[in-house]
Amino acid sequence: MLFLGSHVAMKKPHNFQGAIQTAISYGANALMVYSGAPQNTIRTKTEELKIKQALEIVQNNNLSLNNLVGHAPYIINLANPDETKRAFAIDFLSQELERFAAMKINKMVLHPGNYLKTNPQEGISLIAQSLDLIFEKTKHLKTQVALETMAGKGTEIGKNLEELQQIRTQVKNNTRVSFCLDTCHLFDAGYDLKENLEEIIQKIDSILGFQNISVIHINDSKNECNSHKDRHENIGFGKIGFETLLKIIYHRAFACIPKILETPYINDKAPYKREIEMIKAKAFNPELKKLF
């Protein structure tokens, strides 16, 4: 069965309840939310998120809790060599895991971090140490942190599969570490999904393990392979292309994994309902952007 959805915003006053209703209106059976704005750490109180109402809708629509995904804000950096800033990040992400657990979301996607003025290996060590502290603070939870593949902009860690696996290997309680594949990021980092898809999928298994992949972000790319740009494009309108993305979405190795669209809005309107329809029909609509 295909588990497909998109990022949906949690907006006041309906918050989580509204996000679930929006996802269902798109024809989705999976979704991803931030527990607040991705660009800051301001958060609405958990008791105001309308969690009970949201979970009733989930149950009434036969949605699986395993297909609900959380995402940490972009601005958190566990690789920051500044101890004060890193301590804040550790405390904040511990609170985020508590919030997602209250929402019955069992995985939180995280951009691993930026090593800034140090080096990749030091950054990897700091991320692993930080995750150890986070998992100790939240040892009563089972919520996973899904480390995301990155495009390799600047000093990003996670630009290759090996860096992500190194983090997981160094974490003591690594049963709570999984991975999120992002198609745009992989392509922009130099993994040519268009030309070498099966080879890359086998590499994902040998380095990360299929059993450790918990989320896949489905995005086309505005830029060429190995560009290190990280600019998402609508499905089929970028350099990866519809057919390649379809092969990934329907690949047997990823059958049970929720796929989440993070494609750009078109004229300030969410394209997800139309993109989900295209994917389910397995037919690209070159006129899609004209519909908005």
From Swiss-Prot:
Amino acids binding Zn(2+) 3: 185, 230, 232
Protein residues bound to Zn(2+) 1: 71, 111, 148
Reactions this protein catalyses: Endonucleolytic cleavage to 5'-phosphooligonucleotide end-products
HAMAP family: Nfo (MF_00152)
Free-text function comment from the UniProt entry: Endonuclease IV plays a role in DNA repair. It cleaves phosphodiester bonds at apurinic or apyrimidinic (AP) sites, generating a 3'-hydroxyl group and a 5'-terminal sugar phosphate.
Key words of the record: DNA damage, DNA repair, Endonuclease, Hydrolase, Metal-binding, Nuclease, Zinc
GO molecular function: deoxyribonuclease IV (phage-T4-induced) activity; DNA binding; DNA-(apurinic or apyrimidinic site) endonuclease activity; phosphoric diester hydrolase activity; zinc ion binding
Residue numbers binding Zn(2+) 2: 148, 182, 217, 262
Lineage of origin: Bacteria, Bacillati, Mycoplasmatota, Mollicutes, Acholeplasmatales
Annotated organism of origin: Onion yellows phytoplasma (strain OY-M)
Protein origin, superkingdom: Bacteria
Family note: Belongs to the AP endonuclease 2 family.
BP GO annotations: base-excision repair
EC number from the UniProt entry: 3.1.21.2
Cofactor info, note text: Binds 3 Zn(2+) ions.
SMART domains for the chain: AP2Ec (SM00518)
Name assigned to this protein: Probable endonuclease 4
Gene name in the database record: nfo
Entry-linked InterPro entries: AP_endonuc_2, AP_endonuc_F2_Zn_BS, Xyl_isomerase-like_sf, Xyl_isomerase-like_TIM-brl
SUPFAM superfamilies membership: Xylose isomerase-like
Cofactor: Zn(2+)
NCBIfam families for the chain: nfo, PRK01060.1-1
